[in-house]
């Protein structure tokens, strides 16, 4: 049987609005486990009332096709109160580690918003460097509407960036796998070597470097 795809709920947002919070931002990241490129975060504040068939199509970005992500991205950014994007490159990731880099990207995304949120709904993480009320939700991108929207913004933003990097670093097929550790990507690294945008502290790249 195919796996059941969870429909994100707006229950968290409704509860927070009853408590007096108005500008509720969802946050999520894309590219955390990749071998190349940045980790990218999206922050989105959606209005309480939304109309259109697209609203019921919102899901965790990981279960959507590229075409559907692009379609939903256009609706999300056009209907959002505000949205922001943050990115931390591979050199910073290698220097500070992926968890701090992810938190930094999320902080940048919040700072990119045109108005300050009064509450953050975050996929999994807690963000101690952001002095705002917040809640980390395990599997938040699948369960919470605002976080699911943020996951789509982060994923589409990163995918577009990786397609641009594909032109700068041809032969790695970055536009195809977006920097994830696919068999094709690893084969390209073995043939062409490690590029300036690869994460040198990530396996199997670290093992390749240590073996030189």
From Swiss-Prot:
Q: Does this entry carry the keyword Hydrolase?
A: yes
Identify the Pfam families for this entry: RNase_HII
Where along this sequence does the record place binding of a divalent metal cation?
Answer: 28-29, 123
Is Manganese tagged as a keyword?
yes
Q: Which residues form the RNase H type-2 domain?
A: 22-212
* GO terms under biological process: DNA replication, removal of RNA primer; mismatch repair
Cofactor(s) listed in the protein's UniProt record: Mn(2+); Mg(2+)
Class of this enzyme: hydrolase
InterPro entries in UniProt = RNase_HII, RNase_HII/HIII, RNase_HII/HIII_dom, RNaseH-like_sf, RNaseH_sf
- List the EC numbers from the record: 3.1.26.4
Question: How is the cofactor bound here?
Answer: Manganese or magnesium. Binds 1 divalent metal ion per monomer in the absence of substrate. May bind a second metal ion after substrate binding.
UniProt name for this protein: Ribonuclease HII
């Amino acid at each position: 049987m195919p796996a059941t795809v969870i429909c994100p709920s707006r229950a968290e947002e409704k509860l927070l609005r009853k408590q007096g919070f108005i500008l509720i931002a969802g946050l999520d990241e894309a590219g955390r486990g990749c071998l190349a490129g940045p980790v990218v975060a999206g922050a989105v504040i959606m209005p309480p009332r939304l109309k259109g068939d697209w609203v019921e199509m919102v899901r965790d970005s990981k279960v959507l096709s590229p075409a559907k992500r692009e379609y939903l991205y256009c609706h999300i950014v056009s209907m959002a109160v505000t949205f922001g994007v943050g990115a931390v490159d591979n050199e910073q990731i290698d220097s500070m580690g992926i968890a701090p880099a992810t938190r930094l990207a999320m902080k940048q995304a919040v700072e990119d918003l045109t108005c300050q949120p009064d509450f953050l709904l975050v996929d999994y993480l807690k963000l101690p460097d952001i002095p705002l009320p917040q809640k980390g939700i395990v599997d938040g991108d699948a369960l919470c509407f605002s976080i699911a929207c943020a996951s789509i913004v982060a994923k589409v933003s990163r995918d577009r960036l990786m397609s641009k990097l594909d032109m700068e670093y041809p032969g790695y097929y970055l536009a195809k796998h977006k920097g994830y550790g696919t068999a094709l990507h690893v084969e390209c690294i073995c043939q062409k070597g490690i590029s300036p945008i690869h994460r040198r502290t990530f396996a199997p790249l670290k093992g390749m470097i240590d073996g030189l």
